[in-house]
Amino acid sequence: MEQVSPEVGALDEEALAGALHDDLEEGTSLLIDLSRATDPGLRDRARLLAARMVVPAARVTGEAVPGGSVRLGPVPGEGVDLDLDATLARLAESPHLEVGDLRWRGWRRPGRAVILLIDASGSVTGRPLTTAVVTAAALAARTGSDDELAVVAFWSQAVVLRPVRDPAPPAAVIDRMLALRGGDTTDLAGGLRAALAQAGLASALRRDVIVLTDGMANEGDDPLPIASAAAAARTRVHVLALSSAEPEAREACTRLAAAGGGCLEFLDTAAQAPAAVARILR
């Protein structure tokens, strides 16, 4: 703490960036602690920096194109081929074409809607919250102009932290997550319903729900039929499982992913989340 906040109210951005680079989980955990500091100046500064620093740190390096199939379509700038029909249409509007009037076609990935569903039951501190923040940051880093991102937290109730049609930058949800306070019980079925409601509002044809949970629900309906119905409606339900030594918890996560027709990834550390997200959405 002293390395990144050498004096009251001060925050060393360079030291904090170094901490995130050296250890994403520890650096994010430190940033969360700073965002909940008693010093209001330090707290506000940490929350201001959170999205700006965690999202780039959570980006998967070496991944040239985010996951998903690609198709040929209009692209900005110079693409692989001149779109002659679209360019001639511009010529019909104005006899004097400029470089900016040329229309190109290239490979682009169709838009996709991703809804991150966060288990916020119990005390939302420590590793679960750190993992949730890193996961949201990884998704924000992957969200392109044609994509949609929603974030929902649940315990005995469900709270939409970012609606799927939110015009704000995806990274803005990080600040809302830092202020998250959860509850004691776990209504996974209710959380799934809220996430699927957001998926139903999406414009993208491809829709994925990613559930970050230990799989242990102790309130509400059975979530498996809800996940199965989602898969039948072409919305896949994936699970990022917070690793647990309890066989029952691991089995619950396995069953949920299978019912939702999605992928299952076990996370031992928050730093594993970006790569897990990339595998799920490839």
Q: Which residues are covered by each model-predicted region?
A:
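A generic secondary-structure signal
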Residues: A138-R142, A194-L201, A229
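Helical mechanochemical/support elements of P-loop NTPase systems and associated helical scaffolds
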Residues: V80, L84, A113, P128, ...
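Acidic/polar low-complexity segments with low predicted structural confidence
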Residues: M1-G111
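Von Willebrand factor
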Residues: R108-P167, P170-L212, A217-D221, ...
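C-terminal helix of von Willebrand factor
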Residues: L256-R282
